[in-house]
Amino acid sequence: MSLVSIALLFVASFLHSVWNLLAKKSGDKQIFLILAVLCGALMLTPFALARAQTISATAWFVIVGSAIFESLYYLLLGGAYSRGDLSLIYPLSRGSSPIFIVLIGVFILRESVSWLGAFGVALIVVGIYVLHLRAFNPDHLLAPFVSLKSRASQFALLSGFAVAAYSAFDKIGVTLLNPVFYFWLALGLSVLFLAPMLAAKRNAVALEIKNNAPSILAVAVIITFGYLLILFVLQNNKASYATSIRGVSVVFGALMGAVVLKEEMTPPKILGGLIIFAGIVCIGLA
């Protein structure tokens, strides 16, 4: 993978950690994210229409598939943040997606993964696990697995699968349509799928707009711009590699926790970050 692609993924990953922090601070997490997606789709409209193309039946199938899993992702992530802490949910959601996407990439997309690339993906997964530890002692080694018993962790894990699923559809989609036009269609369809929740929770919608309108708009811009960067990378790179490198957002999340939320920068967080960086280097050389 080229340095330009890795740099774009780094920027997208940083933006991803920023909007997750803003989403965690919101009131109704699911409504907040749906409103952000709606605003993002509206902002993208003129740019997408300028790149409009004829849409084949295959492209529509891919768009619908992506929209379904993207809708599920926002619902699951919002549900997870409503039940658990950012420090638990974010690493689990981002850390599980590389595992799923490698399986999907190899067995469904028929991507060939070199031994160095596979080792890099494995390092990223291990690094995210280490970063998730509270301390280096036997009592804490199984803590990340024990946490899977909670509903919040289960939602986070499912959101990781949703990321892998829509990433697989998107890998195909950007080969069929212009990335901007494709993303607008998938995003717009996601809004339609999620619209019933907005209608059913009108009071929550009004309250969220009243209390968090600036954050909603900020997240809308960040989600839209950040994922467009990823789609451009997917045009010329393996989905398994691109999605795995996006796991660096967990490192950015830990750094934000230390700087913004004044969380302690523990040895596991430092070592986990270094392991993730080593994994990214391996993928870059693959």
What spans do the regions from the language model cover?
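Hydrophobic/small/kink-forming positions within alpha-helical transmembrane segments
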Residues: S13-S17, T45, A67, S71-L75, ...
